[in-house]
Structures are given as structure tokens and as C-alpha cells.
Amino acid sequence: MKTRTQQIEELQKEWTQPRWEGITRPYSAEDVVKLRGSVNPECTLAQLGAAKMWRLLHGESKKGYINSLGALTGGQALQQAKAGIEAVYLSGWQVAADANLAASMYPDQSLYPANSVPAVVERINNTFRRADQIQWSAGIEPGDPRYVDYFLPIVADAEAGFGGVLNAFELMKAMIEAGAAAVHFEDQLASVKKCGHMGGKVLVPTQEAIQKLVAARLAADVTGVPTLLVARTDADAADLITSDCDPYDSEFITGERTSEGFFRTHAGIEQAISRGLAYAPYADLVWCETSTPDLELARRFAQAIHAKYPGKLLAYNCSPSFNWQKNLDDKTIASFQQQLSDMGYKFQFITLAGIHSMWFNMFDLANAYAQGEGMKHYVEKVQQPEFAAAKDGYTFVSHQQEVGTGYFDKVTTIIQGGTSSVTALTGSTEESQF
């Protein structure tokens, strides 16, 4: 076990590494170690994911940027890994709608239990672990052309932190302990938080938002994981703020007040740039939530951030809340992500891809199945396309194998001394028909 002094010296040395260039911490290594306790459990999956995410953002991604899809189940994330996606995005919106611990359906307004997103992070990582165990038990190892690196970095949504700085600190720890590689926090008032594409958004003062970023970074340091921290601002659209106490915000406050006591602000890109610049020293990536897929607005934000913080990594939400073909032509849509990457937006994601694909595909199947010729539509819409996708690496046609039946047959056989008459795949329809 390392002594307190050894931990402090090790942490001080770590903070001099290139990984932390440009990152501000308004606390000391002594402060961090003081909060750890004598035993600090390792968070292996979070460590691996954070390191992998950092490498992907610095030259190892296939396209020169990460383009991610939202997932809300372990199975969705598993299929993303098989298909070649490099990181998983886990949005609070999807968790609110269909994957929260209240077992209810909510809008994206922080109404669900705060530990719901960490629970889904854990669920996804458990699926990755099982898939890895299955291929490993089959003798498939790194270097084998059949090998899939299932442990994708998970970028998780902490919303507005579900409260104050202590809530943000505890939520960040929970995300890391569940295995998240990166976590984002936004600058809205948690008690009335909204989806970035809803109205009625209320900002907190800039310094309060910074303190939540500090809380999140401190939590990562206490756990000993180089978790990537993403700072999101909703200031492009939000025209309310809780207080006029922060001089940094004064140029945007109109003087008008609402019946709730909030102050009106001048929403827009200048307010968003102001906040992005304030957050940049405390975060690994900066994200400006926008109302439309606007390349010129994205360029203005990127240029302003990079004028003061050259090379600062940026994130962009390629949201399903945008009507893409209403805003852009097909050629621009096709080149949209590459153009963003050229501006420095190295993490791009479709927040609600998982829930839209899941709900639409089920509706499409159910509509045909209910109205038409029954099994014909299941075969045409699901089973035959699954068979056709096998050439691209899709394997869920053999659904028993996919979820681990063969793996647990091996467990049974080992326990029973090498032979068993009760293994599940032998004699199954999957064995005989697929």
C-alpha cells in the first residue's frame, strides 16, 4: 500500500504529463489524497475507457474524429461494437424515456433517479464483459481476424448534476465506478433542467457552472481515473439565468426579471462563446448545444474557442431534434461531420439514435404484422435482413450463442468433470437450423 506522501508525489508527477496540458485544478494533490481514504479501489473499465477515448481523440480514430451513436441497452451497444463504432454515447434523454430506475417514462427534465445513468453504464459494460468472455472462451484473442474489441469508451450524460457541487461530485464518482470513460455536465439550473431543444432553459451563473466542473474533476482525481470531462453550454438558446451575482455574466443580463425571480439574458452565440471560454480550462472538451445543424455557427464557436485555447477539443450533438433535410441539402448532410471535424469537433454523436431506431423499427414491424400477412412481414423485415447482414459481421441470427448459451455450456461441462447431458445448445433448434 502506498503511503500518503507517495500518493501525493505520484499525483503531482502525473499532473505534469501532456495529458493534463491546459487543464486548471484549483486544488492540490494533497487535497485529493486527503479525500481518498487508505484504500482506493481501482476502476479498471473506466481507466481503460478513458485511455482509449483519449487516444481516439488524438489520432487513433478511423475517420480522424469519433462519430458515436446513442445507446440505451447493452445489446444496442454490443451491436455498435460489432459494427465498428468507436465509442458509445449514453444520453439522459434516452434514460429518462425508457431506461431509468423508476421504471417509468419521463421527458428530459431530470425527473428520474440520479443513479439511473450510472446503472445503464454498468449494464452496458456488463454486456461488453459477457461478449468478451464468450469470444475468449472460444479461443478468439487479439490478433485473430474474428476478434472484436468490445470495450468501447462510454460517454455518459450527467445532465446539470442533479443538484449542487456535492451532487455533481457524487454523480461523477458513480459514473466512474460504473465504468464511464467520459462524462458531460451542462450549465442549466438542475431543478428546472430541460432538454437542450426545449424552451424554458435557465442558466446558472458562470462561476457556479465552473464549480460543478471542478467538483467533477476532483471526483475523477479522487478515484484515480483520467476521466474525460465535457463542459456543455446551453447559452445559445437559454435566455434566463438564476442570478446577476457573477460579474462575468453582466454583459448579457437585460435587467428584466420573471415572475419566478429569474433574470432575462441575451441568448445567442456570443453568450455561448463567453461561457465556452470560461469552461475551457476546466474541461477536456467543450460543447455548445445548438438549435439547428448550422455549420457557420459551429465555425464561429470553434474559432472563438481556438483563438484563446488553440487545439481545444470540441464536441457536437448531431441531434434527431433537428429536421436535417429541412435545414440542409443531401450533399451538405453527407459532408457535415467531416466539416465539423476540420473545425476541431472531434467527438460527434447522435444522442437519440438508439431509441429512435428501436421505437421506429418496432412500429414498422408491428404495423405490417398487424395489418398484413403475419409471419411474412417478420421474415421480410427482420429475419432475412439479419441473414443478409451476416457478411458484415452481424451474428444475432444465432441469438442463443450471442447471449452466452455456449459459454455457460462450457461452465456446466467444467463443473461436471468434462461431460454433461444437460448442455443447452446441443439439440437446440439453433444448432439444427442455423
Curated annotation (Swiss-Prot):
PROSITE patterns: ISOCITRATE_LYASE (PS00161). Optimum pH is 7.3. Mg(2+) binds at D157. InterPro entries: ICL/PEPM, Isocitrate_lyase, Isocitrate_lyase_ph_CS, Pyrv/PenolPyrv_kinase-like_dom, Pyrv_kinase-like_dom_sf. Its EC number is 4.1.3.1. Keywords: Glyoxylate bypass, Lyase, Magnesium, Manganese, Metal-binding, Phosphoprotein, Tricarboxylic acid cycle. The keyword Transmembrane helix does not apply. CDD domains: ICL_PEPM. GO terms for biological process: glyoxylate cycle; tricarboxylic acid cycle. Belongs to the isocitrate lyase/PEP mutase superfamily. Isocitrate lyase family. This is Isocitrate lyase. It comes from Escherichia coli (strain K12).
